[in-house]
Structure formats: C-alpha cells, structure tokens
C-alpha cells in the first residue's frame, strides 16, 4: 500500500537521528572503521579520488553526508567541504569529528536535500558529491537532479557513487539442497519499499526495531533525469 511520503521521511529521520551516535561512537563504530579513519584512513574509494581528480582549493558539497567521515575525507584531500544532512544528530557528530581531526574550514548544514538551495542561500559548488547508498532515501529522483543542477557551478561536476539497486532487490531463498537468490520486490516498482528491521546495518544486534522506507531507482531513471536536468555541465 502506498505510504505518505512526508510521514515516511519523518520515520526515516527518527531512525537516522537515533543511529547517528551509534555509528559514530557506539557499537556501529567498528563497521565504520572510526578508529582507523581518525588515524588517517580515507573513507573514499581509490576510483573516486581518481575520477574526481585534484580537489585542492575547490568547493565540494556532500549531500546526505550522515556523520561526515566521507565529507572530511575530501577535506583531507584538500577540498573546501560543505556537508548537508537532514539529521541534526548526524551533523553534530560530523562537527565533532571535524574538531577531532583539526579540520577548521569544513561546515555542516542541517537540511533536507529538497531545501538545499534555500538552506545554502543559492551558493554554487565546483563539485556536488553523493555517496553510495544515499539516493534510495529520497522520494523524488527528478527533484534531486533539479536541486543538483542549481548547486553545481557552470563547468563544475556532479559525482554520484552508487551501487546497483539489484543488490537491495535480492535476498537468499531456501530451496531443496541449499539456497538461491530471489527478488524481494519488483525493480519497476515506483512506490516506497517499507519494512521493520531489527538493529542497524552497522550493528545488527543494536536493540530495538525501526520502520524505514526507501525508494529504489534504476540506472536508466537516474541517468535520464540527470542528463535532462544538467545538460550544460
């Protein structure tokens, strides 16, 4: 049954607000390799650094930055970073981390992606970056592309690091003699996928259950809306 998008976003926010400290300094910190990251390990994949190219002195906006470890990894590469996330708890953790590693020119803003242009007062950036596992928490991919088009400078770059939605669509299914992967849901579904789950992806044993809602976007939809909205970049 279709869910109300605003109610879905509120439930997601409640979950992310609760889990931010768990991921940053609680039982989920091992999953995030916080200790290693604080010691200098980058959260960026080698191909991200290679494909984005030199960022020294460039302005970089990280949408849906969560606790800021990816954002601050870009700071370590020399970018002037702005991180944006709708979870106040996550932004507090990001600001705490910036202080811990001595990055004083990064800023973090509490805002939904749809409100980013207003929240950032129309500022434009050399690079707009979105990391893996972020788009599925947005209810409108066309709106995302439109917002990005207003945030990227002429001649700038939108960089999206994302995995195929097929990964989330598959789950193991028991069959005689073992198990096989089957589809959890229809990849052509355009409604939210809602579920109640225990723990966190960073700590499956974390107590309590949370209801979450996500929207899966096929590559063709993402590429099409990005191309239509960002034709001159």
Regions found by a protein language model. Name each.
Residues 30-58:
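Conserved alpha-helix/loop element of class I SAM-dependent methyltransferases that forms part
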Residues 59-116:
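Class I SAM-dependent methyltransferase SAM/SAH-binding core
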Residues 118-127:
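A short acidic, Gly/Pro-enriched loop at the edge of an enzyme's catalytic core
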Residues 126-142:
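A short SAM/SAH-binding and catalytic strip from SAM-dependent methyltransferases
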Residues 142-154:
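A short glycine-rich, Lys/Arg-flanked "PGG" loop and its adjoining helix->strand segment in the class I
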Residues 157-200:
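Conserved class I S-adenosyl-L-methionine
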Residues 166, 207-222:
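Acceptor-substrate binding/catalytic loop of class I
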Residues 226-232:
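Conserved small/polar residues in nucleotide/adenosyl-binding loops
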